[in-house]
Amino acid sequence: MNAAPITQDLLTIPRKLPETAGRNLVGLTREQLHEALIQAGTPERQARMRVGQIWQWIYHWGVRDFAQMTNLAKDYRALLAENFEIALPEIVTRQISADGTRKYLLRISGGHEVETVYIPEENRGTLCISSQVGCTLTCSFCHTGTQKLVRNLTAGEIVGQVMVARDDLGEWPKPGAPKDETRLVSNVVLMGMGEPLYNFDNVRDAMKVVMDGEGISLSRRRITLSTSGIVPEIAKTAEEIGCLLAVSFHATTDETRDKLVPVNRKWNIETLLNALREYPRLSNSERITFEYVMLDGVNDSDEDARRLVRLIRGIPAKVNLIPFNEWPGSPYRRSGWERIEAFADIVHKAGYASPIRTPRGEDIMAACGQLKSATERGRKTAAQIAAEARA
């Protein structure tokens, strides 16, 4: 793992996690783990069996100490401890919203920080995870977009967010206890900091780990990857991950989308929609989710709603309408509730589900579009953020 440069900030907590000599096993695919064990001295004829045993200890039981892997011989446990570690991101802060939403500020290698959000609901719990430190896309309505990209997360740092949340929620099974089918983390959405498709290989490997049936065991139908429209990677996502897809659409003309989602200048609406029409067939997905943030006077007219319906015609889809979540220095305002409902009504009458997302975690800046590492927030004033947003 390449250590990224440490950036200074206002926190007094030590900025860098201790370096260890062992290779982190978290985030390795089965194939990578198999190779690592052989390189560490595991006889090749035993390696496949050892992969299965270690995999279950880490991802089914949530064990972090090789000494607790009691179906392995003591000398083999010692070999593992000498060569490897089971390391997760460190929780710097945990905030709990009035609505039960939890936001974790997590420290990763190099002293960098990312945010992860857990959203409890009546019959499920959704974990929103990050794929990058910062973001390259500079979407003008998104707080994360005001933080420049520092680096991609490793597969281990992506999987680690899921494991940290399960730790905090006490969701790992206990040996000998009755099996509990209730899942507190039942869904994962790649909608946190960063553009997942600009970190494709690590996201793919992380999702392979999360979906593996002998560990965390989340169905690919319980995982949603959200992209701003990185067209060359969309077919690969269908073929190599196969999860559900959400698209940050947000506008119905190239002129408006160029401003809101600048990557549209590279892959415009027509090009994006052509790629999306193929996704359900390639991935066996039932439908694509179009995410549409409601910005007062920008993209929320009746004509926008009718144009949206025309654009997505023929694509199995639903449209998630997202009331804009304001942040310090934001140049936009949330559409009025009546305007949002009128927009939703037009889309619904055209035959598409058009739920209005209930903002969650606004009081702790955990709502959609509000994520940004606390170190970056502390480094800039509201005036600086506003100036960047106008630029």
Curated annotation (Swiss-Prot):
Domain Radical SAM core: 121-363
Catalytic activity line of the entry: adenosine(2503) in 23S rRNA + 2 reduced [2Fe-2S]-[ferredoxin] + 2 S-adenosyl-L-methionine = 2-methyladenosine(2503) in 23S rRNA + 5'-deoxyadenosine + L-methionine + 2 oxidized [2Fe-2S]-[ferredoxin] + S-adenosyl-L-homocysteine; adenosine(37) in tRNA + 2 reduced [2Fe-2S]-[ferredoxin] + 2 S-adenosyl-L-methionine = 2-methyladenosine(37) in tRNA + 5'-deoxyadenosine + L-methionine + 2 oxidized [2Fe-2S]-[ferredoxin] + S-adenosyl-L-homocysteine
Free-text cofactor note: Binds 1 [4Fe-4S] cluster. The cluster is coordinated with 3 cysteines and an exchangeable S-adenosyl-L-methionine.
Residues annotated as catalytic: E115, C368
Binding annotation for [4Fe-4S] cluster: C135, C139, C142
Cytoplasm in keyword set: yes
GO MF term list: 4 iron, 4 sulfur cluster binding; metal ion binding; rRNA (adenine(2503)-C2-)-methyltransferase activity; rRNA binding; tRNA (adenine(37)-C2)-methyltransferase activity; tRNA binding
One Gene Ontology cellular component annotation held by this UniProt entry: cytoplasm
This protein's UniProt keywords: 4Fe-4S, Cytoplasm, Disulfide bond, Iron, Iron-sulfur, Metal-binding, Methyltransferase, rRNA processing, S-adenosyl-L-methionine, Transferase, tRNA processing
Disulfide links within the chain: C128-C368
Enzyme Commission designation: 2.1.1.192
Residue numbers binding S-adenosyl-L-methionine: G194, E195, S226, S248, F249, H250, N325
Chief localisation class: cytoplasm
Cofactor(s) needed for function: [4Fe-4S] cluster
InterPro entries for this protein: Aldolase_TIM (IPR013785), Methyltransferase_A (IPR040072), RlmN_N (IPR048641), RNA_MTrfase_RlmN (IPR027492), rRNA_lsu_MTrfase_RlmN/Cfr (IPR004383), rSAM (IPR007197)
PROSITE patterns: RADICAL_SAM
Family classification: Belongs to the radical SAM superfamily. RlmN family.
UniProt-listed PANTHER family: 23S RRNA METHYLTRANSFERASE, RADICAL SAM CORE DOMAIN-CONTAINING PROTEIN
UniProt miscellaneous comment: Reaction proceeds by a ping-pong mechanism involving intermediate methylation of a conserved cysteine residue.
Protein name: Dual-specificity RNA methyltransferase RlmN
Organism: Paracoccus denitrificans (strain Pd 1222)
